[in-house]
Amino acid sequence: MTTPSLSSILRHTRPIFKETLRAARPTLQNALPNGFRIASESKDGDTCTVGVWIDAGSRWETEKNNGVAHFLEHMNFKGTGKRSRQDIEFGMEKMGAHLNAYTSREHTCYYVKCFKKDVPEAVDILADILLNSKRTEQDLDAERQTIVQEKEDVEARIDEVLMDHLHSAAFEGSGLGLSILGPLENIQKSITKGMIDDFVKTHYTGPRMALVGSGAVDHGQLCDLASKYFGALPTGQPKPSGFTRFLGGDKRETNQLNPLTHVAVAFQTPGISHPDAIKIKVLEQLLGSYSRDKGEAAYSCFARAIVMDFYDPKVGQFFRPNKAGHNPIHSLNAFWAPYSDVGLLGFYAIAEPGKSYGHEWENILHYAMRELIRVSRNISEEEFERAKNQLKLQTMLQLDGTTNIADDIGRQVLSFGARVPLASFFEQLDAISREDLIRVGPRVLLRQGPRGGGDWRHGQRARVRRPAGGDLLRGPLSCPLCTPLPRQSVVCMA
């Protein structure tokens, strides 16, 4: 008996799927006179997520105050004029609620998961910690060691460190090139109460904040609460709109204690609000991922290229696992990191050094680049439809739960000014043709820019000593197969 493909199943169920999407509750949105926005998606039930999303992250920092947005997140839980830290914690426990926050490169979010009846008190606490936090010098000094410990935990994760290096190489000299936690010197000494207060004054303004609700929420009630607690926020200065300059290059850090090689390669793309953004989402899904631990029966381009024999006429050899069945590539995953004005599309690979299909580990880059170039020029109808269907499924899965929905609403309201209905997103996705992707792929992956990593075969590399171990190498990456990498690219290795 033949098992039908995922594409054929979804093709036949598409009409029913569209009706289900049309029946979904709409996202309601209003704004206060000061620009503060309120957005919500309600559904039947007893629980919900309410939170405040703020257009303020590490990209709006400088090298001098790098880390201040994340430091502020910690300080806002230390107490206000009418609530101590213990009062805030007790208030959450009394409601059976959960208070949390996160800081990213572009956004900061504070949210509460609670019962419907407790929404007014939850918003009261959120407004209090955001607008009335005391942020004393004593609390500031006490929190430094906590953040240092958090930084040590993050730096123990190679993937986190590598992605920070990737952003630093791609966007050096701009806010997107800065890490979220900031350097150790800033955390331990440089960040002051004055810096934090200035950051709040500049970025915590009406037009850059939104109250978001998802689940058992009443939109009218949220509007009243927003007017009560956030109506007096200043409009502030317009958000900076400076162009983020993509530089490219490569960074490498040697760690003899790590038995595996981690490699990340990325290319400049348009930002999340660009008309081609949805096509880049499909391209990311098309490339997909491969994991040796999950087996090799996968359908993504990366997975199939690793599993199948891959012959390179230039080298005259097959690139495949050796006869003993040992595959040196542990994983190969595509990613897209989009921001408001720019993005990074690329892949992250983990492999055993010196064992990459009989060549040096740098051949992972060359091998993966061949697949990137192939899909940017020649995509079959089957893999194209599969990628679109998988993107639909992935999008639906990411919207599971009130917190995920609230986060989606908050980020879209800050990025686009409104949330795109899921049905509209799927209609846009269905309208994309294979030719559209073939048009966008080369423009992203093969573009020639004024700066970047240059040809892999040529150029000098500057050596910079890092105090915490290893050498950090900057400059063009040499490739033993002598294949150029597009200039608008960035390479990081650890």
Swiss-Prot record:
<keyword id="KW-0472">Membrane</keyword>
<keyword id="KW-0496">Mitochondrion</keyword>
<dbReference type="GO" id="GO:0006508">
    <property type="term" value="P:proteolysis"/>
</dbReference>
<keyword id="KW-0862">Zinc</keyword>
<keyword id="KW-0645">Protease</keyword>
<comment type="function">
    <text>Component of the ubiquinol-cytochrome c oxidoreductase, a multisubunit transmembrane complex that is part of the mitochondrial electron transport chain which drives oxidative phosphorylation.</text>
</comment>
<keyword id="KW-0999">Mitochondrion inner membrane</keyword>
<protein>
    <recommendedName>
        <fullName>Ubiquinol-cytochrome-c reductase complex core protein I, mitochondrial</fullName>
    </recommendedName>
</protein>
<dbReference type="InterPro" id="IPR001431">
    <property type="entry name" value="Pept_M16_Zn_BS"/>
</dbReference>
<dbReference type="Pfam" id="PF05193">
    <property type="entry name" value="Peptidase_M16_C"/>
</dbReference>
<keyword id="KW-0679">Respiratory chain</keyword>
<dbReference type="Pfam" id="PF00675">
    <property type="entry name" value="Peptidase_M16"/>
</dbReference>
<keyword id="KW-0249">Electron transport</keyword>
<dbReference type="GO" id="GO:0005743">
    <property type="term" value="C:mitochondrial inner membrane"/>
</dbReference>
<dbReference type="InterPro" id="IPR011765">
    <property type="entry name" value="Pept_M16_N"/>
</dbReference>
<keyword id="KW-0813">Transport</keyword>
<dbReference type="GO" id="GO:0004222">
    <property type="term" value="F:metalloendopeptidase activity"/>
</dbReference>
<dbReference type="InterPro" id="IPR011249">
    <property type="entry name" value="Metalloenz_LuxS/M16"/>
</dbReference>
<keyword id="KW-0378">Hydrolase</keyword>
<dbReference type="InterPro" id="IPR050361">
    <property type="entry name" value="MPP/UQCRC_Complex"/>
</dbReference>
<comment type="similarity">
    <text>Belongs to the peptidase M16 family. UQCRC1/QCR1 subfamily.</text>
</comment>
<feature type="binding site">
    <location>
        <position position="150"/>
    </location>
    <ligand>
        <name>Zn(2+)</name>
    </ligand>
</feature>
<feature type="active site" description="Proton acceptor">
    <location>
        <position position="73"/>
    </location>
</feature>
<keyword id="KW-0479">Metal-binding</keyword>
<feature type="binding site">
    <location>
        <position position="74"/>
    </location>
    <ligand>
        <name>Zn(2+)</name>
    </ligand>
</feature>
<keyword id="KW-0809">Transit peptide</keyword>
<comment type="subunit">
    <text>Component of the ubiquinol-cytochrome c oxidoreductase (cytochrome b-c1 complex, complex III, CIII), a multisubunit enzyme composed of 10 subunits. The complex is composed of 3 respiratory subunits cytochrome b, cytochrome c1 and Rieske protein, 2 core protein subunits, and additional low-molecular weight protein subunits. The complex exists as an obligatory dimer and forms supercomplexes (SCs) in the inner mitochondrial membrane with cytochrome c oxidase (complex IV, CIV).</text>
</comment>
<dbReference type="InterPro" id="IPR007863">
    <property type="entry name" value="Peptidase_M16_C"/>
</dbReference>
<keyword id="KW-0482">Metalloprotease</keyword>
<dbReference type="GO" id="GO:0046872">
    <property type="term" value="F:metal ion binding"/>
</dbReference>
<feature type="binding site">
    <location>
        <position position="70"/>
    </location>
    <ligand>
        <name>Zn(2+)</name>
    </ligand>
</feature>
